[in-house]
Amino acid sequence: MTTRTPILAIAALLALSCGSAHAALFPVTGAITVNGNSGDLPAGTFGNSSYDPATGQLSSGSFVFPQSSVTVPVTGLGNVTVIYQLSQNAPSSAQVASDGVAAMTPVAMTLSVLWIAIPLPIATEPCHFSPINLELDGTGAASGLDLEDRAFTVPQTTDPCGGFASQINAALVGNSNSITVHLAGDFTPPAGDTDKIFVDGFDG
């Protein structure tokens, strides 16, 4: 062991402790439209993650949302209250360029339909729609990170969904979908004139 080894080890530990100290859960709000039916997203979080204003990098994290409900028309059943939950399949990160343009690496989500009420609640698990691939881009500023995907696809489920798979597929599957998310926090763009999003290929 050289005399530099302890110094390097201490430096590495300090770097790790500093990085973890800045990790946070960023509050998330937004709205979602699925097959033409719109509603607010339940208040969620993105993290544990940290934003570096010097580079514009938002470190790897995941969206977490609680259960929520939406009323949708279902063929043969009328207006049905759907209790659902969105979950992220794998972490993603984001980049804010010096001009404020922002993009997140591809986000794969799962939409789980937990119950439907017509009007009595009926359990539908398992009933998963995945992957729902989101390409989120937008802007970063001191007031927050605003991202959207104006046209994503909900794939069909092959789960039984409590015997209502065909009706739920008809109600949810398609391309007439959009999502907006707002991450609360200071996402001031970095100084400089390099658009890192296009250099790193986040926009592809």
Label the model's feature ranges.
Residues C18-A23:
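Sec/Tat signal peptide C-region and signal peptidase I cleavage site
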Residues A24-D195:
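Extracytosolic secretory-pathway proteins
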Residues V199-D203:
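Ser/Thr-rich, Pro/Gly/Ala-heavy low-complexity intrinsically disordered linkers and tails
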